[in-house]
Amino acid sequence: MAEAEPLPSPDIDTLAQEGIVLVLDQITDPHNVGAILRSAAAFAVKAIVTTARHSPEATGVLAKSASGALELVPLVLVQNLARALTALNERGFLTVGLDSEGSDDLSKVELREPLALVLGAEGKGLRQLTRETCATVARLDMPGEIKSLNVSNAAVLALYVGASRLGLMGK
């Protein structure tokens, strides 16, 4: 069986200060992370930031779910997500956490580049320190009885809203 080297993980300080970055707060399901990667590639996301622990390995199920996106969207593995968010804030990123209890609908939040959209694990959502480190916490308003989505579906909806509002569609 042939073995391959893992894809390199860039440093958070080398991320382009433009476009959109996704930040994943302890999303452990490889199907969800793979689907998020695939959507991220479709929306030209610059990178996905996630913790080295409490995230699935970039192999097997995740790679299959990502449909080739692992080679297109850099994964930035960090030890401490709150510190990574602080670094993004210091580098000029607008960090927007997504939570059903957010104060404003994402479509009403004044967005700018560079933008970091922060998604929490299903069930638990964003951890408290993650929420506190985000510049703002927004929600995705929906007209139906169910007010929350699977995290991979929430990611694609947030990416669409963000990319549309920032004028990144069709670039």
Locations of the language-model features?
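Post-transcriptional modification and biogenesis factors for structured RNAs
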Residues: 1-171
